[in-house]
Amino acid sequence: MSGRGKGGKAKGKSKTRSSRAGLQFPVGRIHRLLRKGNYAERVGAGAPVYLAAVMEYLAAEVLELAGNAARDNKKTRIIPRHLQLAIRNDEELNKLLSGVTIAQGGVLPNIQAVLLPKKTTKAK
């Protein structure tokens, strides 16, 4: 038991940690950035996988809502305005990104109720 293997299996094609976790976001790159970023002295193996999964979920959520906003405006390309509308119309995303300014995003259309014309009832 000297630690040397007896022949063993030949190394197959390497699989990325992203593909092992079933993610699109790069787990290896996120791990490297966590180590280089002076966030902690050591970074566990599961931390970058979890962070990549969370980031991928948030990106997918924002993109889906922005795609819906683009489709509502009869457009096929998502622009910053669609991102703004998607985020500000979603309660949870708006709370998460309340301190974020989106360049070229504009504002939500909003008219105060007191400024709207009064509804008159017709007497019969």
Swiss-Prot record:
Residues where Phosphoserine is found: 2
Gene3D superfamilies per record: Histone, subunit A (1.10.20.10)
InterPro entries: Histone-fold, Histone_H2A, Histone_H2A/H2B/H3, Histone_H2A_C, Histone_H2A_CS
PTM per Swiss-Prot/TrEMBL: Phosphorylation of Ser-2 directly represses transcription.
GO molecular-function term, one example from the UniProt record: protein heterodimerization activity
Chain spans, region Disordered: 1-23
Biased composition (Basic residues): 1-18
Localization per record: Nucleus; Chromosome
One CC-aspect GO term: nucleosome
Any single Pfam family the record assigns to this protein: Histone
Keywords assigned by UniProt, alphabetized: Acetylation, Chromosome, DNA-binding, Methylation, Nucleosome core, Nucleus, Phosphoprotein
Residues bearing PTM N-acetylserine: 2
Main location: nucleus
Positions of modified residues (N5-methylglutamine): 104
CDD domains associated with the record: HFD_H2A (cd00074)
Family label: Belongs to the histone H2A family.
Record function comment: Core component of nucleosome. Nucleosomes wrap and compact DNA into chromatin, limiting DNA accessibility to the cellular machineries which require DNA as a template. Histones thereby play a central role in transcription regulation, DNA repair, DNA replication and chromosomal stability. DNA accessibility is regulated via a complex set of post-translational modifications of histones, also called histone code, and nucleosome remodeling.
Assembly and interaction partners: The nucleosome is a histone octamer containing two molecules each of H2A, H2B, H3 and H4 assembled in one H3-H4 heterotetramer and two H2A-H2B heterodimers. The octamer wraps approximately 147 bp of DNA.
UniProt-recorded name of the protein: Histone H2A
